[in-house]
Every structure is written in structure tokens, then in C-alpha cells.
């Protein structure tokens, strides 16, 4: 039986599910950019790509060389194809305008070019997260600059989302709104090949992922919930849990999509004006879309993340996502 490449899968989606051809082309271009990023990441010290740039992004985070390289790869790959009205990235303060010499399309691409880049220098997994939205008609123009308000749509408006994870294998995990598929990069073929047909998250779990060093800063409902997880079979939940933490959202969520679990990044008291650390538009929304499509759940502790109306490109949120039973339990504690 012949293997199904990403290109073949997308063509079949166009035929059977009426996936628009321009969306298919856009996903293929993003995938090609991810292959190029994977190649740059794999070179490591041999390619002179390790270390920091000495600059900060809009989040106030020090930019790694590979943050900037990955951002440029995605911009250059996607700006000329005629599929996009604009792009936005973790590494840029403002939306990226499609150069006037290129035609504009109907979609918006939002991405974190290299999630978990603090892991680069220790050779741990990193990844690229992306979200695709339709550009509202009132903001579509071939001649005028794109208004950033075009991007401020709730996650329910996403038409596609996914991530590439650069680990022992490079994988692309994708949803078009009809389940979640996983594609592994065959470097000999140069193609992503369908290897995970129907990714599903179990409703129950005995694993959780959270940065325990922040425990003293958490709100009371989170303190209560995590203490119950740690109490194991002697506590109110009556079962033992294991904790995992990779310090890259893409890697922790990939594990949850592979075998279940709960990922948490709660808000804390150090920056009370900020509702969380992770960014809604290009981290929480695409990952929540994937998790829900795989049968899991995702909230900010109070409401479904995909229902949140964004107020800015770089808005932050608290995140609880993964196996439905545990997400619902953590959310219920916030409402008591």
C-alpha cells in the first residue's frame, strides 16, 4: 500500500471535504518552511545557529538566533504566494504586511516560529506553532495596509491549526477541523508522510505537566488541585499521578496528544495585571483547536479558550488543556 504524503492528504481533503485549494497550498507552504526550520535546527553548533541575538521581542524575551532565523523562513516562504492577507508572529510587534509587489489572499497566518527556543542550546525538543484564519471581508484590500483588527477573532474562527515538532523525528500535526492527523518527515523522500491517522486524547489520565517551581505564586484553586494530584491514591482523587515537564509547550502538548495527560500554565501573583504567560493567538488557540479536535478540552480556568475574544495580537491567557476529565476538574475548582 502506498504511503499517503501530506500533499496527497490535502488533495483528498479538497476533493472530499471541499477544503479550498488556496488553503491547501498555504498548508503546503507552511510545511515546506517547517522542513527548512528543521534543517536549521538540526545543524546546531555546526551551523552557527546556537546562542542569543542580544535583542528582545515584544514579550521582553531574549531572542535566540534560531527564533529570528525561523521567523524569517516563515515570512519569506509565505509572503509571495497570494494566499495571505497578512501574518503575525511572536517575534514581531505588529502585523506583517504583504509586500505590495505580491498579490494578497483571503487568509491570515499567525505563528510562534520557534516555541521552546530556550531548549535549543541543550538539544531538547522545540517546535513551530501556527494558526490560520480567514481575513474578514471588510479588511481585504489589495492596495491598503491590513488593519490588525482583522486578526482579533476568537479561536472558533480558525480554519486550520497545527505545529511541527523538531525532536528525534520531525513531525507535523495538523487539524482542518475534522480530527487530528500526524505526519512524519521522511528525509529521504523529502516529504511529510501520514503516520498517525486519528489522534485521540483519552478522557482520563494519570500524567500532568506544570512548572512546579512557580507553585508559591499560584492562585488558591490551582494550589488545591495540584496538591490533590500530588497526594496520589491516598488523596481525594484516589490514584497516583506522574509529572512531566519539557519547558516547551509544543513538546508537552505533543506528549498529551500521543498518550493523554494534562498541561497547565496557570496565571500567578507575580504579574497580577497579566492573565497568564502563554499567548492566545499563536499558542493557546491553535493548541486548543488541536486538543478539542482530538477529543480533549481546553480552558483558561474559567471559560473555553476558543471562545475568548482577543483584544490584542500578543494577549496572554492561562491554559489548562488535555484529557477532558482533568481539565473539567481544574476548571470547576476555579468556579467554586
From Swiss-Prot:
Its main location: cytoplasm. The keyword Transmembrane does not apply. GO terms for molecular function: fructose 1,6-bisphosphate 1-phosphatase activity; magnesium ion binding. Its EC number is 3.1.3.11. It catalyses: beta-D-fructose 1,6-bisphosphate + H2O = beta-D-fructose 6-phosphate + phosphate. Binds 2 magnesium ions per subunit. Mg(2+) 1 binds at residues 90, 112, 114. GO terms for biological process: fructose 1,6-bisphosphate metabolic process; fructose 6-phosphate metabolic process; fructose metabolic process; gluconeogenesis; sucrose biosynthetic process. Gene3D superfamilies: 3.40.190.80, Fructose-1,6-Bisphosphatase, subunit A, domain 1. Pathway: Carbohydrate biosynthesis; gluconeogenesis. The keyword Metal-binding applies. Belongs to the FBPase class 1 family. Homotetramer. This is Fructose-1,6-bisphosphatase class 1. The gene is fbp.
